[in-house]
Design a protein with these regions (language model features):
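Detector for C-terminal structural segments
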Residues: 232, 334-362, 401-411, 430-553
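Aromatic- and charge-enriched surface segment that lines or borders ligand/interaction sites
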Residues: 93-145, 178, 321-323
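Structural transition elements
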Residues: 222, 350-383, 397-405
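Surface-exposed binding/hinge segments that line
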Residues: 107, 142-203, 228
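N-terminal lobe/hinge region of extracytoplasmic solute-binding protein
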Residues: 49-99, 130, 217
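Ligand-site clamp/hinge motif
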Residues: 210-217, 242-292, 420
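A structural "hinge/loop" feature
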Residues: 51-71, 91-93, 118, 183, ...
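Gly/Pro-rich hinge or "lid" segments in bacterial periplasmic/extracellular proteins
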Residues: 184-252, 256
Length: 553
């Protein structure tokens, strides 16, 4: 549960950041006024094209997947996910749990320097945890106010006073600190990575009002040269003191990295073909362009990351029509995930028959309603008989062409089942998210179930103001079920909750996707790279790729 004094400002600040994280990670972002992309620069200068506009990189910001990849080139995490899907220490040398996983001891690697010369110590991490909790500004008078990360961190380590803070995070020695949680968290090392979000920043960066906007010092392979001045261009330069660099393998390989924002996927493909970009990222709904890239194997390499992100429709259960179970079932039975996925991804996504992929703790193979037009019509008739109203569906959209295309397809399905369906006027992703959290629209299409951990999804299925279906009001026992299950964090623990979520059709699965990365044949070094904590880093993952090893040749 969220502390009341934080709650009112969380939803707004969270939505501002998360509008990109949840919407733009898949749907192309239209960019007007973007400058013409320059030709990819000299041998050691990389140009990477992404679809997501500039976003904040500080602790309380919520960038989307493209910006996370850029951010992780500058700032790094205490732990990281390897290619075996295991969380291993990264900036940390070890992370050890005790006291039923309520107490965690973090031991840091020694000698790691931030870009501004500060050494990574327990005191630095303590300050970062204060920033993660959203208490750095009220406690020190400097830094960011609370937003999404604070919701997550306050949920596991409530901290409202200096006395609580002193008890929660203790410095044991220069490189060792102890973190005391308010609940059991067996997956706390994942929380320290959390898809590349909780990065570690220098103390001066955390206290600077421009933290993550125009400045920032991290421990990563690249340093900020220019950010936030041109919303479509971020320029990074090599860190000469990078901690992973060795005499035998000097890192980073590139001298500079320029991230260029180009919202149109077709333009990103064209830039790769013309040598105006070395690397570009894509979402599954850029299906036509992805299929084109597959025909250019002699010039361009295309790889898909793990297909583990499930997009679902969160139906607002606090008001008609979806306060009525018959209406929710009619929607679920009328939705044809096979045809929807084929239309939207052109073979680059998968139909979603459950709320999560098999590797996710929320996965339950039974319980979701499947496409059945006859049953959908029967549910519509039952709704009308019960309420005396026609079943009128209103679909919200953002400003992208893909969003409109998806809504039009959805309306055709609903109308085939006997419902009336209209599409709302387009709004920005930020406005879409704000309305969703305010339960001011009938449904919200979100990708909250991703990867192989329940940590992020739990924010949207427990009693927080981020829960998009409003079942925390109409079915509070379900929200408590998820909160209790999180303390065990196993599929078995979540099973009762997920089966109820599916049985009530609060969430209706849409489609599954993975991220795509493409690079020219003159770009070298993209691949799995060794991790100091064990295993190798995936070629592409939820937090991007190892840009430190990339160059041209």
């Amino acid at each position: 549960m969220i502390n009341g004094k934080f709650k009112s400002r969380f939803a707004k600040q969270f939505a501002i950041g998360l509008g990109v994280a949840l919407a733009a990670s898949t749907f192309a972002v239209p960019v007007s006024g973007a400058k013409q992309a320059p030709s990819a620069a000299a041998k050691n200068d990389l140009t990477i094209m992404i679809g997501e506009p500039n976003g904040g990189w500080c602790n309380q910001d919520s960038p989307g997947v493209d910006q996370i990849a850029a951010k992780n080139s500058v700032f790094e995490t205490l732990t990281i996910l390897n290619s075996d899907n295991k969380i291993v220490p990264y900036l940390a040398k070890s992370v050890t749990g005790s006291n039923e996983n309520k107490t965690w001891t973090i031991t840091l690697r020694e000698g790691i320097l931030f870009h501004d010369g500060e050494e990574l110590t327990a005191a630095t991490v303590q300050m970062n945890l204060m920033a993660n909790l959203g208490i750095i500004k009220p406690f020190t008078g400097k830094g960011q106010a609370a937003s999404l990360p604070a919701i997550a961190w306050q949920g596991i380590m409530p901290t409202a006073s200096p006395a609580q803070w002193a008890a929660n995070v203790k410095i044991i020695s220069k490189y060792v600190l102890e973190v005391n949680l308010g609940v059991k968290r067996p997956n706390f090392p994942y929380t320290l990575w959390n898809v590349g979000r909780p990065t570690i920043l220098s103390t001066k960066t955390l206290q600077d009002p421009n933290c993550g906007n125009t400045m920032g010092a991290g421990t990563g392979p690249f340093m900020i040269s220019s950010k936030g001045v041109d919303q479509f261009t971020t320029v990074l330069k090599a860190n000469p003191n990078y901690w992973r660099s060795t005499p035998a393998n000097k890192l980073p390989k590139a001298s500079t990295v320029t991230f260029k924002v180009v919202g149109d996927a077709a333009q990103r493909v064209n830039a790769l073909r013309k040598g105006q970009a070395d690397i570009a990222s894509f979402g599954a709904t850029s299906g036509q362009q992805l299929n084109l890239l597959k025909t250019l194997k002699d010039k361009i390499t295309l790889i898909e990351g793990p297909r583990e992100t499930t997009w679902s429709f969160h139906l607002n259960a606090t008001a008609l029509p979806f306060a009525n179970k018959d209406a929710r079932e009619a929607f679920a039975q009328a939705f044809d995930t096979d045809s929807y996925t084929k239309l939207m991804t052109k073979g680059n996504g998968s139909p979603a028959y459950q709320l999560a992929v098999k590797e996710h703790p929320y996965y339950q193979p039974k319980g979701t309603l499947k496409f059945d037009l006859a049953k959908a019509k029967a549910s519509v008739a039952k709704y009308t008989a019960t309420t005396g109203k026609s079943l009128d569906v209103v679909v919200p959209i953002n400003t992208t062409a893909e969003s409109l295309k998806g809504a039009q397809a959805l309306c055709k399905m609903m109308e085939a089942a006997g419902m009336k369906c209209t599409i709302m006027s387009p709004v920005t992703s930020q406005q879409y998210i704000l309305r969703g959290f305010g339960l001011q629209q009938q449904m919200s299409l979100f990708n909250v179930v991703a990867g192989r951990s329940a940590e992020f999804a739990n924010l949207f299925s427990t009693k927080t103001n981020l829960e998009l279906s409003g079942f925390r009001f109409v079915n509070p026992g379900l929200a408590k079920c998820f909160a209790d299950a999180a303390e065990v964090d196993t599929r078995k623990a979540y099973s009762t909750c997920v089966l109820e979520l599916q049985a009530q059709s609060y969430w209706v699965p849409g489609y599954v996707e993975g991220g795509f990365l493409a690079w020219t044949n003159t770009t070298k070094g993209i691949g799995t790279t060794p991790l100091p904590g064990g295993g190798v880093r995936p070629i592409i993952g939820a937090s991007g790729f190892d840009v430190a090893s990339v160059t041209k040749g």
